[in-house]
Amino acid sequence: MGVPKRRTSKARKNKRRSIWGQMAAPTLVECPQCHQLKLNHRVCPKCGYYKGREAIQVAE
């Protein structure tokens, strides 16, 4: 089994772990049908439209 040859320094360890604090929030866009915020390239959960046509039936 592999064993580290040298001890990992605090700086190297912290650099590797630093990405967790920089994760970006998901991009939200306005639905052209109902003007609610939705995820990009996804069906709108509020009205069920995607690219100008109804993709799913939404119970109201």
Curated annotation (Swiss-Prot):
Q: What is this protein called?
A: Large ribosomal subunit protein bL32
Q: Tell me the superkingdom of the source.
A: Bacteria
Which gene holds the coding sequence for this protein? rpmF
Fetch the HAMAP family from UniProt. Answer: Ribosomal_bL32
GO CC terms: large ribosomal subunit
Pfam families (alphabetical): Ribosomal_L32p (PF01783)
Query: Does the keyword field hold Ribosomal protein?
Result: yes
Q: Which InterPro entries match?
A: Ribosomal_bL32, Ribosomal_bL32_bact, Ribosomal_zn-bd
Q: Which organism is it from?
A: Moorella thermoacetica (strain ATCC 39073 / JCM 9320)
Q: Does the keyword Cell membrane apply?
A: no
Q: Which GO terms describe its molecular function?
A: structural constituent of ribosome
Could you provide one GO biological process annotation from this protein's UniProt record? translation
The family assignment reads: Belongs to the bacterial ribosomal protein bL32 family.
